[in-house]
């Protein structure tokens, strides 16, 4: 039998991260535990729906004599500025409308026009946020909730520096 090497995984996707994860949160925790880990951060895309599974399974492990710490977090969809993103989107949308109005005067490359708007809509980066303490967990809950509001959401829940700075206490980014 090989010697286990202690580790803590700080970025794992469960099956709750559609098209990017596999298994239930409990499966990830069990795998980590059986391979030398005593903690694991579940960081699903844009939400924390696996948190209840983490809490319940950690209690089950503790009752069985295993000391395993779930680390609560999220892989956020992050942009430097949501205001700039909205402006770019509106500008691209208006340019597309202008081209559509002027279609009788010129021939539009429809695919290129759609691609320009689509690229702006899909623009995002990934940022791992981990809760350092209860305050951090509460702040991540607020960040995730804010990212799903209409102004921040188009296919993906987004957050930016302004939002992150409002709710940064106890959050490791």
Provide a role label for each language-model segment:
Residues 1-173:
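Phosphodiester-processing cores and adjacent nucleic acid-binding clamps
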């Amino acid at each position: 039998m090989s010697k286990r090497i202690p580790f803590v995984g700080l970025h794992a996707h469960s099956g709750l991260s559609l098209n990017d994860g596999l298994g239930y949160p409990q499966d990830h925790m069990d795998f980590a535990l059986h391979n030398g880990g005593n903690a694991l951060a579940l960081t699903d895309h844009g939400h924390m729906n696996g948190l209840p599974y983490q809490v319940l399974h950690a209690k089950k492990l503790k009752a069985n004599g295993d000391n395993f710490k779930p680390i609560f977090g999220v892989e956020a969809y992050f942009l430097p500025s949501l205001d700039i993103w909205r402006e770019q989107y509106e500008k691209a949308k208006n340019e597309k409308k202008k081209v559509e109005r002027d279609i009788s005067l010129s021939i539009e490359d429809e695919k290129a026009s759609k691609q320009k708007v689509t690229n702006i809509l899909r623009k995002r980066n990934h940022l791992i946020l981990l809760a350092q303490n209860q305050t951090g967990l509460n702040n991540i809950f607020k960040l995730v909730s804010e990212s799903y509001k209409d102004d921040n959401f188009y296919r993906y829940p987004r957050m930016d520096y302004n939002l992150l700075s409002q709710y940064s206490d106890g959050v490791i980014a």
